[in-house]
Amino acid sequence: MQSGIFCADIGTSSLKAAFVTEEGTVLKFMRLPFPHPVRAVDWVQAFFASWRTLPADYAVEAVCISGNGPSIVAVPQTYRAPGVSTNAAGSLSAAVPSAGGINRADLINGIIEAAKHDTLFLWNEPMPQGITVSAIPAGASLFLPRIAAFHAKYPDIFANAARLFSGPEYLSYLLTGAAVTSLPDPRYEAAYWRQEDLTRVAETFLHIDACRLTGLLPPFVTAGTVIGSFCGIPVIAGVPDFIAALIGTGTLTAGTACDRAGSSEGLNVCIPQPCRAEKTLLLPSVIPDLWNLSSVIPSSGAAFSAFLVSHGFLGNDYIAAMERITEEPFVASGAYPETFAGQGRAFVEGLAFRIRRGCDALEQTSGFRPVYTLSGGQAHNTLWCQMKADITGRTFALPYFADGELIGDAALALYGLGNDKGRGENLALIAQRLIRIKRYYEPDAALAHRYTEKFLSHSETA
């Protein structure tokens, strides 16, 4: 019998899931793409499709879900959560009966059927015509502008809604029947909603009673809390994918850092005191009294995919493309040739210089010179990771499992289970125990020197 945590992360285009042991070994990993356009039920079907792939001898000790935000899911007033099992059994046999004599397969099918009536409004869906974020009196909230946009786009659905959930809380609700909003830290309340912001948006923008809007939004609970159970398996309040990745890369003590790179890229460093700099973003850490300073490189991976497509490659053929690009000789000054390899070399050098500027900004502000733990799809490209190290002059650490969100989910679940599974450790120590480094990408001294000279010459002429 293998024991572990079932972790799931709701992405924009796919759901990733993993079964992670208490020692950080990933025994199973799944990635299920969503259809386009994606619906709420597609999230649910992908979650249970990944669940069903687990062998019968895998004992799930807890479930923890992270996801993108601020996506909104409306559950209608006519919805009734299926009876959730209180069985103590942790194995995955569908034949194990739930409370009331309903077996697990029937329970799952009932949840999927109910989800067909729920409405998803993704975080990146365009605002309805005539509405701008700046026009919504939402303060610092990331969610209230999306709720206002949802109200404008789907007024009838909004009027009939019983609850509005973000992604992780929605799936957790379907599993447990517990309607909650998971708060990473009390300092994040303003980024979700404060009562004064709710009242102002309800009365001056939505033109509804403030109590109506307040009633739609589930109450806050602390991330890492056991909010209920699914067939006797504890379900832990998860966090947004950004926070999960910080946990799963160990960016939880002052001076630790990560490079989370997929379709876009975010450099992060944990700092002891709040400090700001131009072109950086300051947010609370999930660890009390600590902070996270970020530098974001928008669409880094997406732009590279578009570049590949424009040159006849598949948009995800990164490794083959990098093999050709790295064969192009380095040019210290002047233009690269008008070939795929030449223009590709120019593209990735330019991208790495942007990353270097981001590292510079974080380090000058924080006073740390950290090793950056890698997370995300770009971490799997060896040639790119080494080139990034050479061009930026930084060291990058590659974990054995580079999907930091899922390791973060596992750490949060073990923390939520308490002393029995968390071994009495705090969240930072649990995460450190789960993260195992496979290799380090360190800058080659000679290459780093010539890239530094080129970078400085570009900076002087910029």
Language-model features, listed with the residues they occupy:
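Phosphate/pyrophosphate-binding loops at sites that engage ATP/ADP/AMP, CoA/4′-phosphopantetheine
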Residues: F47-A62, K153-F158, A202-C211, G358-P370
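Gly/Ser/Thr-rich active-site cleft segment
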Residues: T12, A135-F242
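Short glycine-aspartate micro-motif
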Residues: S3-D9, V60-S66, L164, P234-G248, ...
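N-terminal phosphate-binding loop and adjacent alpha-helix
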Residues: V26-Y58, V133-P137
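Glycine/Thr-rich phosphate-binding loops that ligate phosphate moieties of nucleotide
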Residues: M1-L32, I65-V133, D156, V269-T280, ...
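Short coil/turn connectors at secondary-structure junctions
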Residues: Q2-S3, H117-D118, A159-A162, T214-L217, ...
